[in-house]
Amino acid sequence: MSMRPPDPGQASSRARARMVERLRAQGIADEKVLAAMMQIPRHAFVDEGLAFSAYDDTALPIGYQQTISQPLVVARMIEILRAGRELGRTLEVGAGCGYQAAVLSLVATEVFAVERIRPLLDRARENLRPLRLPNVRLKYADGNLGLPEAAPFDTIIVAAAAAGIPGSLKEQLAPGGRLMIPLGSADQRLVMTERHGNIFRESRFEAVRFVPLLTGTE
């Protein structure tokens, strides 16, 4: 009797379903965010040797001293930004392997994702191509500077930690817009800034661990 090999698509779907149920148990309640996490295949954004860990709640290395954020952090940041509003035109700083941009594409009108490391940007393009997401645009740029040619943005999400919020990013936030960034070095916290005219109001959330936000391009 011959044995049929397991269907990787079905295995991935089951693993994603378990991940989503874990996210729900961890407090993620935004059904649109959970649906996006269910739809995007996280294993397609990591090296083949790490695919078995793709749906664990952990950050994974993607090369160049960068990581793909743990699923809970991705879901939590987007859920906070979506509370009571739509994301609209969104800037992601630190595209990395492209996973978060893919998730954002399902909950935002447009996604502009910038990455300062050229080989990572190329990898993100390769990872995203099979998904055919028409509302995602990738750009090779220093994320500290934002993307002035596409500003203003209703939402800005930064996937790297900084000592303070870069002024360029605040300037590119639309009135009523929200910006999420990890702040701190050893002790980091998620901080959301909301723009009301020229006034920026900050709200602080849980502790996190991100790679540092660096300047320039590589």
Curated annotation (Swiss-Prot):
Keyword terms of this UniProt record: Cytoplasm, Methyltransferase, S-adenosyl-L-methionine, Transferase
MF terms (GO), sorted A to Z: protein-L-isoaspartate (D-aspartate) O-methyltransferase activity
Localization of this protein: Cytoplasm
Pfam families with a match to the protein in the record: PCMT (PF01135)
GO BP field: methylation; protein modification process; protein repair
Active-site residues, Swiss-Prot/TrEMBL: 69
Catalytic activity line of the entry: [protein]-L-isoaspartate + S-adenosyl-L-methionine = [protein]-L-isoaspartate alpha-methyl ester + S-adenosyl-L-homocysteine
One Gene Ontology CC term in the entry: cytoplasm
EC number(s) from the headed UniProt entry: 2.1.1.77
InterPro entries for this protein: PCMT, SAM-dependent_MTases_sf
Cited function: Catalyzes the methyl esterification of L-isoaspartyl residues in peptides and proteins that result from spontaneous decomposition of normal L-aspartyl and L-asparaginyl residues. It plays a role in the repair and/or degradation of damaged proteins.
Sequence similarity: Belongs to the methyltransferase superfamily. L-isoaspartyl/D-aspartyl protein methyltransferase family.
Protein name, UniProt field: Protein-L-isoaspartate O-methyltransferase
Biological source species: Aromatoleum aromaticum (strain DSM 19018 / LMG 30748 / EbN1) (Azoarcus sp. (strain EbN1))
High-level lineage: Bacteria, Pseudomonadati, Pseudomonadota, Betaproteobacteria, Rhodocyclales
